[in-house]
């Protein structure tokens, strides 16, 4: 069942539409089995061996699909035959070769205060987290990361049963609570005392509510940082830092995406810049990356292409899922990742991961 609801920021209006549909699992599975490799081929040079290995594998499978009588027993037998052919003749023989690794971390960025009221923020986080929990029931490999204890506090106050389910997923290791700060705070204007208290209250909440000692400062949507931050982080028991936007300079681009950031007192924290982006089109500037990524082949390829420290590491990161106003990953994201995890010819392979695992591996590589 699908519920579509739209409200306009410019006028008092609301539109609601409901649809009830039946998902054909067999056909849906074949759709993704064919679509994701085909999208991967579109990212490759048509003269490359990888391009033709993908197309040959798809052609063999498609030729087995009997379209003369859709949804008949013969049709479903042919669908299964096509999927078996793909697994045995393409995935097992042409995929999974030695390739870079892209960690895929489920994530939804929620601005606590931006283009909506705090009351709407409370609703956004409940809807987003509920979607995560329902998808976890359908996809046992799914892992999700979310920062900002303020959001968890909203859920605890307004949806205690939802909060109880989150606690259970945290215990199972499928829901990652990280980020260190109470909010993903601005780091230009606040005083040092303010930043210290962001971390104090953030880490205390995570420890008391989830039994988690946060070690990563997670600020994907913040626009600048105090040079005193490494010292503050180190003294707070935080030794890793992830961010995005400071790498967006058009002319004076920082030549590093993974490095040790040394503060004014000599304190150091391992720092990682997100490199998630689609492959740029011809003539398109390679400036922006995203923290609201997808697992599409174009983004898997573009994320690896953008990463600058290939001489040290063969791993990088996509945080996938709708964000800013919440929304989180979708079923489409997870189905797509299951196919990019094959290690499609010419592309990096992917795996569902956590922020902690990625940061630890990246730091170890350096």
What does each of the following model-derived ranges do?
Residues 1-366:
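Catalytic-domain carbohydrate-binding cleft regions of carbohydrate-active enzymes
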């Amino acid at each position: 069942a699908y519920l579509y609801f739209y409200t306009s920021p410019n006028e008092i209006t609301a539109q609601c539409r409901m649809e009830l549909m039946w998902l054909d699992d067999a056909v849906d599975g074949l759709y993704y089995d064919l679509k994701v490799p085909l999208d991967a081929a579109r990212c490759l040079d048509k003269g490359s061996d990888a391009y033709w290995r993908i197309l040959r594998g798809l052609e063999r499978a498609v030729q087995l699909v009997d379209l003369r009588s859709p949804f008949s027993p013969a049709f479903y037998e042919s669908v299964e035959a096509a999927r078996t052919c793909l697994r045995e003749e393409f995935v097992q023989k042409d995929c999974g070769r030695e390739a870079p690794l892209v960690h895929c971390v489920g994530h939804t960025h929620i601005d606590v205060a931006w283009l909506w009221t705090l009351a709407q923020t409370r609703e956004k986080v409940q809807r987003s987290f509920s979607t995560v929990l329902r998808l976890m029931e359908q996809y046992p490999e799914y892992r999700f990361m979310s920062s900002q204890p303020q959001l968890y506090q909203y859920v605890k106050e307004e949806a205690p049963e939802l909060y109880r389910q989150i606690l259970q997923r945290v215990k199972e290791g499928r829901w990652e609570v990280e980020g260190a700060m109470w909010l993903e705070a601005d780091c230009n204007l606040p005083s040092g005392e303010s930043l210290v208290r962001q971390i104090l209250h953030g880490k205390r909440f995570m420890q008391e509510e989830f039994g988690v000692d946060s070690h990563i400062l997670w600020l994907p949507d913040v626009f600048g940082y105090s040079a005193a931050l490494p010292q503050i982080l180190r003294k707070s028991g935080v030794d890793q830092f992830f961010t995005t936007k400071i790498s967006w300079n058009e002319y004076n681009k920082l030549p590093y995406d993974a490095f040790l950031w040394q503060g004014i007192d000599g304190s150091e924290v391992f720092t990682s810049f997100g490199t998630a982006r689609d492959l740029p089109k011809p003539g398109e500037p390679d400036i922006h990356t995203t923290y609201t990524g997808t697992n599409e082949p174009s983004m898997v390829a573009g994320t690896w292409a953008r990463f600058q420290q290939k001489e040290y590491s063969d791993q990088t990161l996509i945080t996938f899922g709708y964000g800013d106003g919440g929304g989180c990953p979708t079923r489409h994201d997870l189905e797509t990742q299951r196919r990019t995890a094959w290690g499609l010819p010419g592309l990096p392979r992917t795996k569902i991961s956590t922020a902690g695992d990625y940061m630890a591996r990246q730091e170890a590589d350096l």
